[in-house]
Each structure stands twice: as structure tokens, then as C-alpha cells.
């Protein structure tokens, strides 16, 4: 084959690679953004939405270690909501985008798990039912998983690359801009006041100034060893954001460190002899991870002044970002202290198994809905350790197994924690397919291709079923105390009667049920929506929402004179809500309150 033919073949391979990457990214994007509001917000999403609403409207958020997790979710979502509005689609989009970027980031591992391996891993991540489901949730998990992959890719590139690439420069610039964005918005709002045009004008001006400063910082970094330290600084930034996102960061980081040590030990103990190693090195292989060793990492750190500077810079980046977010951009000093206290609180929380599924919960859930990934990742781990050749594949396998074991041992279990180990499992599964397809054995090649196709088909169906059909079905593995789809019908009815009253969003709504999340989010624009969590005397409210069964007797006693019963709606498993409206607003189908426990007639409603 002459040089022209070689060049043509390379171009063809490059074209196939680019088209494949674009197609997989398109699938990931479609699955994460299509019908994003089809399922109502979960209880936790509603609480996160409440924190974000306060930050959006009042510019105030104070980190409290007793309230959910870290502050990053709210500040990242703030940028989205300022541009696209405080809407359900917007807040979920601010999470979904990181689900897509996880898939994109996987393409950069092609040197370490093979081209076919990285494409397959990315496809599995794009199609994983759990990855898609949690990407469509306004919670911390997906950004957390993205950061964990960001740490790995950054460190690998720091060891293996000599010069910073364009995308790493772009990511560094983005991190710097994000760090300053809330301050920009705050200053713009303060100077612009109630004038929207002025707010946008000041915001644009501040943004331009910050962009110039960021460009100067990037230029300075590029003059330092061709920008190679950028990768380590990115790893430090991702690590800091990881801890500022969720307390489980120490489990992820600890598992990664243990995995690195175990890979080194395994290769030392079970190192193949020189003849077999030479044969393995000469076999067809597009994986080039030979540089991923400690001496090369130590060399990349440099010595003398360079070593001191890169160490100090990494520590400063880590501390600055952590303090920045936990202190609510230097406005809440107690938040930094709370970041440390959070681990004592999390230790108590982690000692309870709310799902009552025992230590095998994740294996059970995984085999129910992520079986292709679980099985192929096990095969990939086996291949990696039998070969003892591909360091990154061994690391990914141990990373996956370590997290799986850690979360299985810890009593506290929720389905969304599983995606932390589904990520490295997809990498190991992709590696398994790569090794089979790259084999000289035609039967093994065919088997690898068939397994990839079967896995893709199974995952595609399960993803569709979970995310677009049975998204609130408690029999599904990832559905955990989720809000029932009937809840959206309740919100529609509240809006209908509020409009019918002529008062619209000024209508008075009394929520006396002790269970009401995520209703706070959906009624955020109703100025007189009150959440009492207990029965109160009401005389002038247009609408009342009460808890069925538990409050029925007292509801009938207190509200029968002025209110009628409309319908009962499921909030979540075991919790139903009754909708009452003032008699002058009620339709002909409304009932007296003493009749609200009568059986539903066929065709009468939900």
C-alpha cells in the first residue's frame, strides 16, 4: 500500500471516528433533553429548586451541612436560569448537559481503552438507563460523576501529553468564568436595579472585562511548559468541585487512589515474562497507555522551582474554589466550617438503609436494568487483569469494583449512587468489546460485535421504558419514592381554579398536608401559596390541599361549610392528596366533603 493509499485510509478512519462521535453524542443529547418535563420533580428536586429560587430571586444561598449536599448545583444552575428563566425545563437542562459531556469526555480515552472501546463505552454511557434517568433529575449526582471522570482524564493527560490542547484551555477558561459569574450577576443586578436593559448591559460589560482577565491568565499558563500544568490545575479544580458537590467525594477519590496502587502491585506480582510481554507488545493493539506510570507523573511535575510552583498553584486552586463555593462567594464564612462538619452528619446518615434492600441492593438493581453493562464490565475486568498489560483498563476495573464494593458495604443506599460505579463499568465494558473486536480470531471478533449489538438493543429498550414510559413505577430499579404523574394533573387543576377565580397567581392556596414537596417549586409564582404542614382554619382561600385519610375527619369538620371536594391525586407511594375548592368556584362534578371517600366511579377521573 503506497503513501497516498495510507493517507486515504487514515482519512476514512478519521471520518468514521468523527461521524460515530457525533452520532453517539446526538443520541445522548436526545435521550437527556427530549420530554425533559414528562415526569414531575422528585421530592429532592423540589427542595433543590427551592434553594435555587431563593438564590435566583434574592441573591442569597447559605450552605448548611444539614441540608442536602454541596453548593455547586445551585450556582451552576443560576447561570442557566438567568438566561433561560426559572423553569422546570431549564433547571433540569442545567444537569442534563453534564450527562452529555460525560459521554463526550469518554471519546478522549481512545488511546487508553482503544477507539472501539471508547466509542462503545460512550455509547453505553449514552444509553445507560440509570445515566439517562439521573441526567434528567435536578440533583447533584450527574455533575459529581462528570467531575470524577474529569479528574481521571486530566491526570492521564498531564502524564501523557506534552502540550495543553485547545479543549483543555477552553475548560480552564470556562472554570474561571464560572467562578466569577455569580459575582457578575450580583453586581449587574445591584447597578441595574429594576431596569432589565441596564442589568443586561452591566452584565455584558462585566463579562467582557472578566473574559479579558481570563485570557491573560490562560496566556500566562501557556507560556509555562507549553501549558502542560493546565491539566493538573484542571484536575485540582475538578477535585475541589467534587468535594463542593457531594460528601461522597472522599469515597470516589479514595477508591481511585487504591486502584492505582493495586494496578502497580498486580503488575509487579503477576508480571508476564519478557518473551510473552514482547509478544503481547507486538500484537495488534491501538491502546497506548505505556506512559501511565509513576515515574512519568513525577517527571511531569518537574523539579526545583517548577515543582514548587505547580504544587502551590494546585493547592491554591483547590482551596480557592472550595472556599469560593462553600462561603457563597465570600458572603457566608460559616459555610467553610460547615463543609468540614458535613462529614460527621453524613456518617450518621450513611449508617441507615432507607431502601431495606441489604448489601446486595446494587447488584440486584444492576442486574434488573443495567445487566449488559454489569456483565460486559466483569468480562473487561477479567481480560485486563489476565493480560496485565493495559494499565488504564485495570485501573477502570478496580475503580468500578471498588466503588461498587464500598457502596454495597455502606448501609445507606439510594439508586442514584449507583451511577458513580456505572461510569467506570461502562469504560471496562467498552474495553472488553475493544479487545474482542481487535482479536485476530474471527470468531472472537464476531462475538464482540454481536455482544455490542445485543447490549445496545437491550439498553435502548430499557432506557426508553424507564425514562419515557414507567418513569414513576416503583417496580423500576431507579425509581425511588418518586412523585406520581398524577401530581402534574393536580397542578393543572390548581392553575385552572386559580384562573377561574379571576385572581390567577394572586389566588390564595392553603396547603395543609404535612407532605407536599415538590409542590413548593410548582407554586413558586403564586404569591399567596402557604405551606402549613398541618390543619389551619381557612375561610377565604380559593384552594386547599389536604392529605387523604390522615386528615379526612378533621378536614370534613373544618371546611365543609365553604369548600367542595374535587379529586384525589397520588403524590408518591403511600401519600395521596385531596383537592378542595371554594364552593363558588367548584364545577358540577365536585362533591360535598363527607362524600370524598366514596369509591371513584368508572370514568370519573384518575
Task: State where each predicted segment sits.
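A short, well-structured beta->alpha microelement
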Residues: 523-538
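Solvent-exposed loop/turn segments at secondary-structure junctions
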Residues: 130-131, 240, 403-404, 515-516, ...
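Surface-exposed patches in mature extracellular/periplasmic domains of secreted proteins
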Residues: 62-65, 505-509, 531-534
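Membrane-integral, polyisoprenol-dependent glycosyltransferases
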Residues: 2-446, 463-466
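Membrane-proximal, lumen/periplasm-facing interface regions of secretory-pathway glyco-
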Residues: 346-349, 445-507, 512-527, 572-605
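Flexible, charged surface loops at secondary-structure boundaries
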Residues: 312-316, 498-505, 535-540
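Short, hydrophobic beta-strand segments that form beta-sheet elements in well-ordered domains
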Residues: 509-513, 531, 544-546
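Periplasmic/luminal catalytic loop of GT-C fold multi-pass membrane glycosyltransferases
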Residues: 324, 536-595
Amino acid at each position: 500500500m503506497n503513501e497516498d493509499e495510507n493517507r486515504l485510509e487514515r482519512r476514512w478512519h478519521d471520518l468514521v471516528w468523527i461521524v460515530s462521535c457525533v452520532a453517539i453524542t446526538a443520541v445522548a443529547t436526545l435521550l437527556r433533553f427530549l420530554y425533559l418535563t414528562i415526569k414531575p420533580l422528585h421530592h429532592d428536586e423540589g427542595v433543590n429548586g427551592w434553594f435555587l429560587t431563593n438564590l435566583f430571586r434574592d441573591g442569597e444561598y447559605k450552605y448548611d451541612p444539614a441540608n442536602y449536599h454541596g453548593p455547586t448545583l445551585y450556582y451552576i444552575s443560576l447561570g442557566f436560569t438567568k438566561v433561560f428563566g426559572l423553569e422546570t425545563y431549564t433547571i433540569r437542562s442545567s444537569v442534563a448537559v453534564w450527562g452529555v459531556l460525560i459521554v463526550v469526555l469518554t471519546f478522549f480515552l481512545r488511546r487508553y481503552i482503544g477507539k472501539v472501546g471508547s466509542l462503545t463505552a460512550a455509547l453505553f454511557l449514552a444509553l445507560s438507563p440509570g445515566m439517562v434517568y439521573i441526567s434528567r433529575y435536578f440533583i447533584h449526582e450527574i455533575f459529581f460523576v462528570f467531575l470524577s471522570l474529569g479528574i481521571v482524564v486530566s491526570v492521564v493527560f498531564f502524564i501523557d501529553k506534552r502540550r495543553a490542547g485547545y479543549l483543555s484551555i477552553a475548560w480552564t477558561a470556562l472554570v474561571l468564568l464560572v467562578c466569577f459569574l455569580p459575582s457578575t450577576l450580583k453586581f449587574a443586578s445591584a447597578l441595574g436595579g429594576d431596569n432589565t436593559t441596564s442589568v443586561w448591559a452591566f452584565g455584558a460589560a462585566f463579562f467582557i472585562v472578566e473574559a479579558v482577565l481570563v485570557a491573560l491568565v490562560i496566556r500566562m499558563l501557556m507560556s509555562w511548559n507549553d501549558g502542560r500544568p493546565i491539566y493538573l490545575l484542571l484536575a485540582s479544580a475538578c477535585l475541589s468541585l467534587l468535594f463542593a458537590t457531594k460528601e461522597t467525594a472522599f469515597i470516589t477519590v479514595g477508591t481511585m487512589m487504591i486502584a492505582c496502587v493495586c494496578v502497580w502491585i498486580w503488575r509487579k506480582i503477576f508480571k508476564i515474562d519478557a518473551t510473552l510481554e514482547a509478544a503481547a507488545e507486538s500484537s495488534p493493539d491501538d491502546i497506548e497507555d505505556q506512559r501511565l506510570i509513576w515515574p512519568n507523573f513525577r517527571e511531569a511535575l518537574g523539579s526545583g522551582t517548577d515543582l514548587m510552583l505547580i504544587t502551590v498553584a494546585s493547592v491554591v486552586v483547590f482551596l480557592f474554589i472550595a472556599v469560593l463555593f462553600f462561603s457563597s462567594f465570600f458572603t457566608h464564612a460559616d459555610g467553610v466550617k460547615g463543609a468540614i462538619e458535613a462529614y460527621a452528619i453524613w456518617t450518621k446518615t450513611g449508617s441507615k438503609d432507607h431502601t431495606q434492600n441489604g448489601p446486595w441492593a446494587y447488584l440486584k438493581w444492576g442486574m434488573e436494568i443495567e445487566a449488559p453493562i454489569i456483565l460486559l464490565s466483569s468480562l473487561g475486568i477479567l481480560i485486563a487483569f489476565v493480560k496485565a498489560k493495559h494499565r488504564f483498563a485495570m485501573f477502570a476495573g478496580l475503580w468500578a469494583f471498588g466503588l461498587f464494593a464500598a457502596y454495597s458495604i455502606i448501609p445507606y443506599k439510594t439508586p442514584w449512587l449507583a451511577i458513580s460505579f456505572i461510569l467506570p463499568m461502562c469504560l471496562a465494558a467498552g474495553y472488553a468489546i475493544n479487545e474482542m473486536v481487535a482479536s485476530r480470531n474471527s470468531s472472537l471478533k464476531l462475538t464482540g460485535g454481536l455482544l455490542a449489538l445485543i447490549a445496545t438493543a437491550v439498553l435502548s429498550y430499557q432506557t426508553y421504558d424507564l425514562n419515557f414510559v414507567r418513569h414513576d413505577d416503583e417496580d423500576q430499579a431507579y425509581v425511588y419514592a418518586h412523585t406520581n404523574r398524577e401530581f402534574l394533573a393536580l397542578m393543572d387543576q390548581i392553575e385552572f381554579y386559580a384562573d377561574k377565580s379571576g385572581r390567577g397567581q394572586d389566588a390564595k392556596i392553603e396547603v395543609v398536608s404535612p407532605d407536599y414537596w415538590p409542590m413548593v417549586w410548582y407554586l413558586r409564582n403564586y404569591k399567596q401559596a402557604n405551606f402549613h404542614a398541618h390543619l389551619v382554619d381557612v375561610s377565604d382561600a380559593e384552594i386547599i390541599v389536604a392529605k387523604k385519610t390522615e386528615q379526612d375527619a378533621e378536614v370534613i369538620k373544618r371546611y365543609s361549610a365553604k369548600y367542595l371536594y374535587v379529586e384525589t391525586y397520588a403524590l408518591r407511594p403511600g401519600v395521596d392528596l385531596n383537592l378542595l375548592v371554594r364552593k363558588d368556584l367548584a364545577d358540577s362534578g365536585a362533591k360535598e366533603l363527607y362524600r370524598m371517600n366514596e369509591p371513584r366511579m368508572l370514568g370519573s377521573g384518575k
